[in-house]
Amino acid sequence: MKYDLELDNVLSLFDGMSCGQLALDTLGIKVNNYFASEIDPYAIKIAKKNYPNTKHIGSVVDVKGADLPKIDLLIGGSPCQSFSNAGERTGMDGKSKLFWEFVRVLKETNPTYFLLENVRMKKEWENIITEQLGVKPILINSRLVSAQNRPRLYWTNIPNIEQPLDRGLLLKDILQETWDDKFNLSEKACDYMSRLRNGKPRWEYHTNPLNGKSACLTANMYKGVPYGVIKEQLRRLTPVECERLQTVPDNYTAGVSDTQRFKMLGNGWTIDVIAHILMNMKYYEPVITEKQLELI
C-alpha cells in the first residue's frame, strides 16, 4: 500500500546500504532530500547504485546539526556489536558507544520524528538508551513479516506502533530454485558439521530447517564456521535469499562481492518492519518527549 506523505529532509545515521530509504520508497513516501551518514565504501556504493540522489555526508562524528536544514525524520541503527549476543558484549564501551553520536545529533537537529533500531541487550543498557531518548522501545521480531528470526528493539516517537500481522513465511518459501555450486558445502565442511558439540552434531546448531525460520543473519555469517546452512540441501544461503529474508528486493545488493553483500545484509534492517513503523507518520502526530521539550 502506498501512503500519500512527503518529507522535505530525512537524515539517516549509520545508513549502510540505505535500508531507511528503501522502506520509505516501499511506502511511496516522497523524500526531497535524503542525507546519509556512512563510511563503509561498499555499502555506499550500493546506496548510490539504487538511490543516486542521496546526499552522502560522511562519518557521523562529523555531522553537525547546524549544517543541516530542519530534519523531518532522523533514523539510525547504531553499531550493535557491543550489545549483541553475537558480538563483544561490552555495552557502551565498545563500538556501540557511537550511540552517543545519535543522541548528540538528535539534540542538535530536534527532528519531527525519530527512530533508532538495535539488538536485544542487557536491561541496564536498554534502560540507558530509553532514558536518553525519552521513549520506551518496541520489540518486533522480523519473523512476523519474513522467514527470518530477528528480534530487534525500536525506539521511536512515532505513536501507536502495533505488532505486524504474521505472514506465516517459512524458509522454503523464499529459496531460489537453482543456485551456484559455490554455495554447496564442501566435503570438509560436511565433516566438520558432523562433529559433536556438547554431545550433538553441529548440524543441530548451525542449520536452518526448510519448514521453519532462518536464524538471524549476521554481518560475519560469511566467515569461518558454516552458518546459515540448509541441511536438506547441504548448502549455504545465497545473497538473493538473504535479501529475501530481509524483505529487500532481489539483487538490490548486487555489484559488490558476495562477502560484502552478506555483511551489509547482516548489518541491515528488515525493510517491511521499518516500513510498518514509518507508515504511522501518515496518521499520527509525533509524541513530544521530555527530552525534546528541553530543547524548545
Could you tell me what each predicted segment is?
Residues 2, 63-73, 78-235, 241:
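Class I S-adenosyl-L-methionine
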Residues 5-10:
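Extreme N-terminal starter segment of soluble prokaryotic enzymes
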Residues 13-18:
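Class I SAM-dependent methyltransferase "Motif I" SAM/SAH-binding loop
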Residues 33-35:
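Short beta-strand element of Class I
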Residues 40:
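Conserved SAM/SAH-binding beta-strand->alpha-helix loop
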Residues 47:
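Conserved SAM-binding loop
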Residues 53-59:
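Conserved SAM-binding strand-loop segment of SAM-dependent methyltransferases
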